[in-house]
């Protein structure tokens, strides 16, 4: 046998060889075995083994880092020793060994070693072992140790002693001294030492020529991968170069033999051909362990898990059938449907061995509810399970909403279930803590994320290390507009002229990006994924450290293959919002609101959706979504819960781009009739206006029209969704054939008749699948009480069957799992119900829970409900929003003390303690000063001054301005940020006298000279009496014709300025950041943008505008670079350092491409007009 030793891209920055490709490359080079030896990582063994087949042996190895004392840094931190002390300690450098797994126990030994190296006490930038830990594992005889290459033990002065320790511990039979015969002085010295040790300790020498990339030309790519991983630029003077590793390509065995012989001659060291042949074979034959899939390992939840689950499910179903949930109790006539579905699901779960999983998830949900942790009604496909509903995992009735169990679990395949669970975002950590306490830390861990370089990230990362201008690098942003995200950079170059231009300008950077695409970029941690195992995790996987969290070594793609079942434990802030609102309601009314009992046909709530009053409502708060809801609210059918569900499923890029959303809205408004392909399909798509929107619709259609089993229907869903052309072809052919078979009328024992598809198969009493006709002929009992066939109906024509299948394929990639939008729309509905019936409590909770970027919109929206948000009041406010009802019955919300800049939680508590100390109310400012703590960490003079400025003391300070007085607005805008929605009225005029105009001209002349713009400079257009400065991102062709911004063109924008903003050109000072028309052949350079920006800041300081309207991301970033410019659109901000109110807009050129954005611009300009006219 011939073995190729490889290091894959799982060794970050050390290899440019993809694990998925390594086996094929080795096979093509004539090898029959691959030895993987990644740095402290064995995850590559799964893709290697899956690619290997039966003709290639994959030996799993790992390069282990060893240091003298891996716990030193941890102990030093605990002892609070200084960094200087740590750095001054004389310590020997780390070194490495490569361990090869011989058998099953050897795999566990390696898992334990790597878990040990990843413990917090030993992890320091990288996982590390102590020599005695390695020796103890080696002594068991289950692994083979090889000396390593870079970082080899032979670089240590005491290498002989170290190797002697290991040989003494485990014997010399499993220890090999390795020669890597690279023709470099470094390796010559290392290899001579390796041969001397082998001779002295009677250790077998062996030779390998490890591969870290495919071809010799790829040596630079490995170097670049290292720079990308370590954030090093290619022209950095001291960047790490590794010349002795520049021939680690995949070479044939002859290359190894020739290199070994050359080493022998060069260094006068005797070698044998056996080192590259029989000794390798001995190692390969000794390593019999191969990675293989493992059975599921779940905690044992009961002695008889199926019986326990059945008992719980039956009890739960009895309760559900007699309890009104979301305004609905299943009628008695449907109870048999629920019972039959429960039996079917339980049979499936029992047969597949998933009962324990359901019990485990139920236990977690029950614990959360019992401890008051808010949980969601469901998420993803698990909402389609009746058993999950019965035992309290979900709160979605799948039969009421037409959801399918098979979308969650395919009864014909052992696909492990994957439940997505929503919990309070604020208390999610308690859920994780419970899992660790309940099952033990050794059984619970997170899941890592393996991130890969896609086309855009490969281009950006290589551009960064090559020092490419940021403006040129921006070409990568165009990739996201393409439908196919699997294209290579070479293929993208053929489609995008801008990328071809980039590749021509930066050929080396582009070539490197092409080579790097799809390589591993880094390791992270899955945001929600958790593993709970029934065996110690170390028996199946190393447990690694990702940040401060423990993770298994294999990502979510491989969990199932390792028999490890994933739970997604997600945090959802809206659950905190709902819980907070309920607590406010309890305080104000004494009511305990049960949001799971509210009816889904509340007309007031549905009218709120139809009017687009969804600011702050889960999933539905964006401007375009609110507009869509208004459109649907004006339709021929009244708004319903089903409409809300469909809207959330449709409002995604796929359905929008494909035209599905437009068709749905057009049918809803009566502009077109729904598409009709067949009465069966018409009935299935009636709830979605004839649009095949849900995957469940396609699954049901294949069963009803072509007799597919639900498991086959799920296969259709998967194949179409993943664009598996081969499966789609075979399933399409089957659909067309079976759809022509037609239906039969079957008489039942009770005298009724059912119409059943002739090709539909049912599980009979003997366990076999048969059609009704086959079962009746064989005399075998069917699951239904069928007596005989009484008639038949013809099937579809071949043409019609093909037409329907084509419709499935066309929309299949954009169809959505109905279970998810149903479950999440329940949360949206609960949010809207609270907002409709308890608006003050809703807004108080929303302002407490949701991010500051949402505050302005919420405060503005609260006003439409007659609710004002007021500054803090020392006699009312606390560390949260407080609700008060005024004498006229209106409600107001008092901001918390912490809403004022500089007032911390300590400050809030200090004021509240002082207020309690004086009887619950301050009578005067003097009493406040006397009672409150004034320590630096509590309520110091600066905090008190800020509180006084915003009006917090107005109620106890006679003669002071009321908190709502407009004179306080400037201070409130400065100190309370987004809770203030009124624009600050200018306290000074916007003066553009002849002197200042002349100064602007001087600045422009200096800019033209310093930047070499000459006549290309585009100057500001200065109105006769400007009221506002309008800042564009850059000049366009219209500006270039006149040499001034906006003197020509911009017709749509000017019309909006006039009609919505009451602004004429004489009222404007129009300028732009980049004062040159962009060259058609190239974008602005990074340096040009920097210079333009600096001059723009100078211009703002010189002109001193009172109001500014930004029209683009560059303009917006001049004033706020903390938020994304797109998130700031429609907001305003007072900047005290400039004494200016900034209204954030967007590039007016968008109006040419998206006229619908005009409504948003009009709203911004109306606010500008209202502010200026005050």
From Swiss-Prot:
So what does this one do? Answer: DNA polymerase III is a complex, multichain enzyme responsible for most of the replicative synthesis in bacteria. This DNA polymerase also exhibits 3' to 5' exonuclease activity. The alpha chain is the DNA polymerase.
Could you tell me the keywords of this UniProt record? Cytoplasm, DNA replication, DNA-directed DNA polymerase, Nucleotidyltransferase, Plasmid, Transferase
Enumerate the GO terms in the molecular function aspect. Answer: 3'-5' exonuclease activity; DNA-directed DNA polymerase activity
UniProt-recorded name of the protein? DNA polymerase III subunit alpha
GO BP terms: namely: DNA replication
The SS bond pairs are none
Q: What class of enzyme is it?
A: transferase
The reactions it catalyses are: DNA(n) + a 2'-deoxyribonucleoside 5'-triphosphate = DNA(n+1) + diphosphate
Q: Which Pfam families match?
A: DNA_pol3_alpha, DNA_pol3_finger, HHH_6, PHP
NCBIfam families in alphabetical order: polc
Q: Could you give the subunit structure recorded for this chain?
A: DNA polymerase III contains a core (composed of alpha, epsilon and theta chains) that associates with a tau subunit. This core dimerizes to form the PolIII' complex. PolIII' associates with the gamma complex (composed of gamma, delta, delta', psi and chi chains) and with the beta chain to form the complete DNA polymerase III complex.
Location(s), subcellular: Cytoplasm
SUPFAM superfamilies found in the cross-reference section: Uracil-DNA glycosylase-like
Q: Which gene encodes it?
A: dnaE
What the record says about family reads: Belongs to the DNA polymerase type-C family. DnaE subfamily.
Query: What are the EC numbers?
Result: 2.7.7.7
Predominant localisation class: cytoplasm
Instruction: Give the UniProt entry's GO cellular component terms.
Output: cytoplasm
Q: Which InterPro entries match?
A: DNA_pol3_alpha_NTPase_dom (IPR011708), DNA_pol3_finger (IPR040982), DnaE2/DnaE/PolC (IPR004805), DNAPol_HHH (IPR029460), PHP_dom (IPR004013), Pol/His_phosphatase_N (IPR003141), Uracil-DNA_glycosylase-like_sf (IPR036895)
């Amino acid at each position: 046998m011939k073995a190729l030793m490889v290091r894959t891209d799982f060794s970050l920055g050390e290899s440019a060889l993809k694990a998925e490709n390594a086996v094929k490359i080795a096979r093509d080079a004539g090898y029959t075995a691959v030895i993987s030896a990644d740095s402290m990582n064995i995850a590559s063994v799964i893709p290697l083994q899956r690619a290997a087949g039966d003709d290639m042996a994959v030996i799993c190895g790992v390069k282990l880092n060893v240091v003298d004392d891996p716990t030193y840094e941890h102990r030093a931190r605990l002892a609070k020793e200084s960094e200087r002390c740590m750095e001054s300690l004389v310590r020997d450098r780390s070194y490495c060994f490569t361990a090869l797994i011989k058998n099953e126990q050897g795999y566990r030994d390696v898992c334990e070693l790597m878990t040990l190296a990843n413990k917090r006490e030993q992890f320091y930038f990288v996982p590390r072992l102590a020599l005695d830990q390695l020796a103890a594992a080696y002594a068991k005889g289950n692994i083979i140790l090889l000396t390593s290459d870079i970082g080899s033990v032979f670089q240590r002065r005491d290498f002989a002693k170290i190797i002697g320790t290991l040989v003494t511990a485990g014997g010399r039979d499993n220890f090999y001294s390795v020669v890597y015969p690279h023709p470099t002085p470094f390796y010559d010295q290392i290899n001579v030492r390796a041969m001397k040790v082998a001779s002295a300790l009677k250790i077998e020498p062996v030779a390998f020529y490890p591969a870290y990339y495919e071809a010799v030309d790829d040596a630079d790519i490995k170097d670049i991968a290292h720079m990308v991983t370590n954030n090093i630029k290619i022209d950095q003077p001291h960047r790490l170069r590794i010349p002795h590793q520049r021939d680690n390509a995949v070479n044939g065995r002859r290359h190894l033999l020739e290199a070994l012989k050359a080493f022998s001659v060069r260094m006068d060291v005797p070698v044998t051909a056996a080192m590259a042949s029989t000794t390798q074979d001995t190692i390969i034959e000794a390593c019999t362990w191969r990675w293989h899939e493992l059975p599921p390992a779940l905690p044992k939840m009961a002695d008889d898990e199926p019986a326990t689950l059945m008992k719980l499910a039956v009890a739960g179903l009895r309760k559900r059938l007699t309890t009104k949930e979301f305004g609905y109790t299943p009628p008695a006539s449907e109870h048999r449907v629920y019972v039959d579905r429960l039996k079917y699901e339980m049979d499936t779960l029992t047969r597949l061995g998933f009962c324990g999983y359901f019990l485990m998830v139920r236990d977690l949900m029950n614990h959360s509810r019992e401890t008051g942790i808010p949980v969601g009604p469901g998420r993803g496909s698990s909402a389609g399970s009746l058993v999950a509903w019965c035992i309290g995992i979900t709160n979605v009735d799948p039969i009421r909403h037409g959801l399918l169990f098979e979308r969650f679990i395919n009864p014909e395949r052992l696909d492990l279930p994957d439940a997505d669970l929503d919990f309070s975002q604020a208390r999610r950590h308690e859920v994780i803590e419970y899992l660790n306490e309940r099952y033990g830390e050794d059984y619970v861990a997170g899941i890592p994320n393996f991130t890969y370089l896609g086309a855009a990230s490969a281009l950006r990362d290589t551009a960064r290390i090559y020092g490419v201008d940021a403006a040129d690098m921006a070409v990568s942003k165009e990739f996201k507009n393409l439908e196919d995200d699997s294209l290579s950079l070479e293929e993208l170059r053929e489609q995008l002229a801008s990328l071809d231009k980039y590749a021509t300008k930066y050929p080396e950077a582009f070539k490197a990006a092409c080579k790097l695409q799809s390589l591993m970029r880094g390791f992270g941690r899955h945001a929600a994924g958790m593993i709970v195992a029934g065996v110690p995790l170390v028996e199946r996987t190393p447990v690694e450290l990702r940040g401060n969290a423990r993770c298994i070594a294999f990502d979510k793609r491989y969990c199932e293959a390792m028999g490890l079942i994933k739970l997604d434990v997600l945090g959802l802030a809206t659950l905190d919002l709902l819980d907070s609102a309920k607590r406010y309601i309890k305080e104000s009314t004494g009511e305990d609101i049960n949001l799971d009992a509210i009816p889904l046909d509340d007309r007031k709530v549905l009218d709120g959706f139809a009017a687009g009053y969804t600011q702050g409502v889960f999933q539905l708060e964006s401007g375009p979504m609110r507009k869509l809801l208004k459109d649907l609210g004006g339709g021929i059918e009244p708004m319903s819960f089903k409409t809300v569900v469909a809207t959330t499923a449709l409002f995604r890029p796929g359905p929008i781009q494909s035209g599905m959303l437009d068709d749905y809205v057009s049918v809803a408004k009566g502009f077109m009739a729904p598409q009709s392909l067949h009465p069966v399909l018409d009935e299935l798509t009636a709830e979605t206006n004839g649009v095949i929107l849900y995957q469940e619709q396609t699954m049901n259609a294949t069963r009803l029209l072509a007799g597919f089993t639900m498991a086959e229907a799920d296969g259709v869903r998967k194949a179409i969704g993943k664009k598996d052309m081969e499966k789609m072809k075979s399933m399409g052919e089957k659909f067309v054939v079976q759809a022509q078979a037609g239906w039969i009328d079957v008489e039942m024992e009770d005298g009724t008749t059912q119409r059943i598809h002739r090709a539909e198969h049912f599980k009979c009493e003997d366990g076999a699948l048969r059609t009704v006709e086959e079962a009746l002929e064989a005399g075998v009992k069917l699951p239904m009480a069928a007596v005989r066939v009484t008639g038949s109906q013809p099937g579809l024509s071949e043409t019609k069957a093909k037409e329907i299948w084509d419709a499935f394929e066309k929309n299949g990639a954009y169809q959505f799992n109905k279970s998810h939008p149903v479950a999440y729309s329940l949360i949206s509905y609960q949010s809207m119900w609270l907002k409709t019936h308890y608006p003050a409590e809703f807004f108080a909770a929303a302002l407490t829970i949701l991010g500051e970027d949402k505050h302005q919109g919420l405060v503005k929206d609260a006003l439409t409900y007659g609710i004002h948000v007021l500054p803090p009041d020392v006699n009312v406010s606390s560390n949260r929003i407080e609700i008060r009802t005024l004498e006229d019955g209106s409600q107001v919300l008092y901001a918390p003390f912490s809403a004022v800049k500089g007032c911390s939680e300590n400050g809030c508590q200090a004021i509240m303690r002082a207020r309690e100390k004086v009887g619950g109310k301050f009578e005067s400012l003097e009493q406040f000063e006397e009672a409150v703590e004034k320590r630096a960490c509590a309520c110091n003079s600066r905090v008190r001054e800020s509180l006084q400025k915003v009006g917090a003391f107005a109620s106890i300070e006679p003669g002071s301005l009321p908190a709502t007085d407009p004179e306080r607005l400037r201070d409130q805008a400065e100190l309370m940020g987004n809770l203030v929605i009124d624009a600050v009225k200018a306290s000074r005029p916007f003066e553009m006298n002849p002197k200042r105009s002349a100064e602007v001209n001087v600045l422009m002349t200096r800019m033209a000279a310093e930047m070499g713009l000459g006549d290309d400079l585009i100057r500001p257009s200065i109105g006769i009496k400007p009221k506002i400065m309008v800042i564009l991102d850059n000049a366009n062709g219209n500006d270039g014709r006149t040499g001034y911004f906006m003197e020509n063109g911009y017709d749509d924008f000017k019309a909006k300025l006039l009609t919505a903003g009451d602004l004429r050109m004489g009222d404007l000072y129009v300028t732009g950041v980049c004062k040159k028309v962009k060259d058609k052949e190239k974008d602005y350079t990074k340096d040009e943008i920097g210079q333009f920006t600096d001059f723009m800041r100078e211009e703002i300081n010189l002109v001193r505008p009172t109001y500014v309207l930004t029209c683009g991301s560059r303009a917006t970033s001049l004033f706020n670079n903390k938020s994304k410019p797109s998130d700031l659109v429609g907001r305003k901000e007072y900047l005290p350092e400039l004494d200016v109110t900034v209204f954030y807009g967007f590039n007016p050129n968008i109006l040419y491409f998206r006229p619908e954005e005009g409504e948003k611009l009009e709203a911004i300009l109306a606010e500008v007009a209202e502010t200026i006219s005050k």
